[in-house]
């Protein structure tokens, strides 16, 4: 890596790990405000997941892709080689087989070569495992849970049953070997969430003992697993079938299977530390000096509690939200949503993204529905009509507010402007007509009619400029000022004079231009009109 004092590009975030980047030449500096850029992984996902339905047309779709790609790749900070390395690494992780992809991503490779080395290491391990001593189908079946057995194809189940009739039959080379080996590998790669859920299902029925410190009981653990039985309802039929089907596959009688189940069920309610009378005899534990069944009590001192206990507690919370119908959570504010699309829309409130722009005035919105409502101010459309009096409104909320005047006395109309308000809000509204300014700045004591105007004014004192131009990184305290500034980059002129067709970037320029036509109608000479223009 070249020596220098420059600042390297920011890390790429979780999921797609950072690429090794050379430092810039001495004296180079990161552009001001670059620290305010959002997480590159978030930008990458926005670039990859942009849908055509979210934009107004093909031109806007192309423009959005350019903007999102630039936010992700940061060409002002990275060289061409570094950008190519980033793209190749991402595509390499995408095309990897699923079992390799998860392993490589977990190790966070910093370059394509490192990712390839990790993939090769795992591939060799998997290939070596398939060449080891053959495992019998009985061994494979013993390692399968009931859920995994149910997921096996019917043909593979039949093949396993035929093979287990011969106790010495092995999983030989061929298609069947590959199929069963894949199942075993998938089992070993089960996620912690799935493992936690299976463990909770067994614990909630008392089928397995919970190993904690010596002397703890199952009742001690019930407090740590609140409402486990409610959150993890078990269906009896698959579980009961599992007690007979899989033992029968292994050649174990139903009585033997039931006796083993009863052994676990009873041990779940025992105090860990009591004597367990079995034919295997008792041994004295060297740590606590008590006699216990060999192997069972020893786990209290040698084995930590189930590795998924902490994950299981988190799983309970996740399942509760899933059953309530809000499975999608925002990582920034932890607010939950029913639909993934609602989560994407909400995340724009954190990123400040406003992809929907009005072609008439250039105002941008984060939601397409807000753009549709805004466009009615230009078209004059009023699609919502009152069925009682026939009055029409632009928005459904305005219609709902109007309909209250027909059926309730709690809502009154302002005599000054005709708007409808609740009685408690009407008095506040009337202050505006009286010239009252109830919202006062504590710094300069300037007063405002609206609270939102006060918030905007306070940014003058705090110096806060939350709105940034992604082209030149200049920042502004007002969103309207940012919109006007962005037109200097796009060349957009949304304000059109309907008399001569000339267009302008700002509404004030249009108003100043329209005075020319007004003076012409008033009978003034053209020379005087040009003189007024020069004097402005």
Swiss-Prot record:
Occurrences of domain SCAN box (ranges): 44-126
GO cellular component: nucleus
Keyword Zinc: yes
Residue ranges, annotated region (Disordered): 18-45
Record PROSITE patterns: SCAN_BOX (PS50804), ZINC_FINGER_C2H2_1 (PS00028), ZINC_FINGER_C2H2_2 (PS50157)
Subcellular location: Nucleus
Transmembrane segments: none
Zinc finger motifs (C2H2-type), residue ranges: 328-350, 356-378, 384-406, 412-433, 439-461, 467-489, 495-517
Biased composition (Polar residues): 26-41
Cross-link Glycyl lysine isopeptide (Lys-Gly) (interchain with G-Cter in SUMO2) per UniProt, renumbered positions: 20, 207, 260, 413
Record domain KRAB: where: 135-196
Source superkingdom: Eukaryota
One GO molecular-function entry: DNA-binding transcription factor activity, RNA polymerase II-specific
BP GO terms, sorted: regulation of transcription by RNA polymerase II
Entry-linked SUPFAM superfamilies: beta-beta-alpha zinc fingers, KRAB domain (Kruppel-associated box), Retrovirus capsid dimerization domain-like
Keyword Transcription carried by entry: yes
Keywords: DNA-binding, Isopeptide bond, Metal-binding, Nucleus, Repeat, Transcription, Transcription regulation, Ubl conjugation, Zinc, Zinc-finger
Family: Belongs to the krueppel C2H2-type zinc-finger protein family.
Function: May be involved in transcriptional regulation.
Protein name: Zinc finger protein 394
Biological source species: Rattus norvegicus
